Amino acid sequence: MNTKTALSGLLAIQLIIIAGLWWYAQNQSNSNRSQALLDIHWENVDKVTITSETGTVSLGLGQSKNSGEWQLLGDGLLAQSDKVNDLLEKFEQLKVTWPVATNQTSHSRFEVDQENAQRRIAIHSGENLLGEILIGSSPGLKQRHIRKGGSDQVYVVELELADIPPKTTDWLDRSLLAANNVDRIEGADFVLVKSGESWQLSHKSPSILKNQADPVAKNQQEIENLLSSLKKLRVTGLVKDKPDLAEGHAVKLDVTSGDNSWRYTFQENNGQHFVQRNDRDTLFTFAKSDYEKIAQSSQLIVASQEEQKVEDKEE
């Protein structure tokens, strides 16, 4: 009888141990199961703000959300939509498991508090804040401490600050002034018009075309260079405090593409190079090499009457 009782007790203890181990394993499995950092409806996101020590960048979808075009809010300028969408996709795919800290006192140490976070990301749908992400210090290569707004839990995730630049110009669509499918260009001394697949070139008094006998063929390289420069035009930054450009040299071109017509003003002043288009109030900087290509191409197409007379005499 005592033996049976002892065996029964031992069996009960074993069952308790097995149940405990099973419960512990299940609890560990649930704890290690990854879950999304932000459980929100990402398809409704239409505004993102990125705040750092350098300021705040606000990005929003245009009036037509279906267009998918992101803009720099406040400036009304096109942003790099692919870059914004890639960032949102990274945030959507952020998965977390076991936190490295769970109390508020750890936030400043990991730089995920409101004051010291290296990036604060606010994600909106209309006026509603869907979620906030605070990104802090790096515990290792391509890793960041991260915290969801409103939560004390701190996690480590794979994320790089290089994917979340803090400046407006980092998100600006640098090709926003590029002119594609151009069919007419008018400069100070010439008019270039596309007719079918060919171009017609004429001069404006008092200048005359170089190689006037066959102007398009003789100026083909300059024409192609000018068209290419307009198509590949890239800005490098925004000018908040506009300088006095009255003393600088300016190249003005009236450009037509289908139903769109623009006046470009390219200027050089004190070693800096600026471009502005008449459909925008913003003054942009752009590369010296691009300025020189446009200025040179537009000047090479024509020559003054005196220059042409000299060339004729030499011939």
Spans of model-derived segments:
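Secondary-structure "cap/kink" motif recognition
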Residues: 1-315
